[in-house]
């Protein structure tokens, strides 16, 4: 008799392997994998756009330095009542507890500074990074699976996720199975990635001719749309009073993304497209 599908979504635990005093966690491995794949992809896309791929290698360092600390700070700020009592946990990022919206904010600020220093168009960089960013998010979400965190409400759907009792919210301790929101978001992110990559390669042939900034705006709007829905299922949302912070930020992301696209394509002033871009020489 086949095992219920739910057992396919039972975390083996957060630790991949322990070698003496060294502990390698799934979360860290997935983040590292996402970064490596993202850098390689963005370099490849840069070559196709006739942009120096080394520029993207340098940018990736700035993005990591900007995004990861910002993701942690964002999370800690909205969980301050807990971390104020245990300040030693603030730096324990390997235990989980980072917010993708914080990473996007920190990474964007880092990219703006990088673009200013290198004297290259920010929006050109943003377009080249957008597919890598959403693919990295799809990979990184599986860290939530291994940590048994960021899951949804109780459910009996065939694809339900088992959560150990010690990881369940106190008011839901009697429930065993929950929505695998990590899976929902990972699938959504892959769909957004497919859309962005399709637009990128079709634009190489000029069908359609995309203006600089298009891919990033599409990323911002579409990712935020999926997150808006998925966040409503979660049991551990960061809150500000009665509001789910991620949903507020997602609504903002949808608005900014759509407004950005309207600004690019509706206004009368012609803007350069991204069919051919000059090589960076630095």
From Swiss-Prot:
Q: Which PANTHER family match?
A: PHOSPHATIDYLGLYCEROL--PROLIPOPROTEIN DIACYLGLYCERYL TRANSFERASE, PROLIPOPROTEIN DIACYLGLYCERYL TRANSFERASE
Q: What is its EC number?
A: 2.5.1.145
Tell me if Transmembrane is a UniProt keyword of this record.
yes
**TM region(s), chain numbering:** 19-39, 59-79, 90-110, 120-140, 181-201, 212-232, 245-265
Task: Name one matching Pfam family.
Answer: LGT
Kindly list the GO CC terms recorded for this protein: plasma membrane
Main localisation:
membrane
Q: Which gene encodes it?
A: lgt
For biological process, the GO terms are: lipoprotein biosynthetic process
The residues listed in the UniProt record as binding a 1,2-diacyl-sn-glycero-3-phospho-(1'-sn-glycerol), with positions renumbered to this chain, are: 141
Q: What class of enzyme is it?
A: transferase
An MF annotation (GO) of this entry: phosphatidylglycerol-prolipoprotein diacylglyceryl transferase activity
The name on file for this protein is Phosphatidylglycerol--prolipoprotein diacylglyceryl transferase
Pathway involvement of the protein, from the record: Protein modification; lipoprotein biosynthesis (diacylglyceryl transfer)
Which family is this protein grouped under?
Belongs to the Lgt family.
Which source organism does the UniProt entry give? Answer: Trichormus variabilis (strain ATCC 29413 / PCC 7937) (Anabaena variabilis)
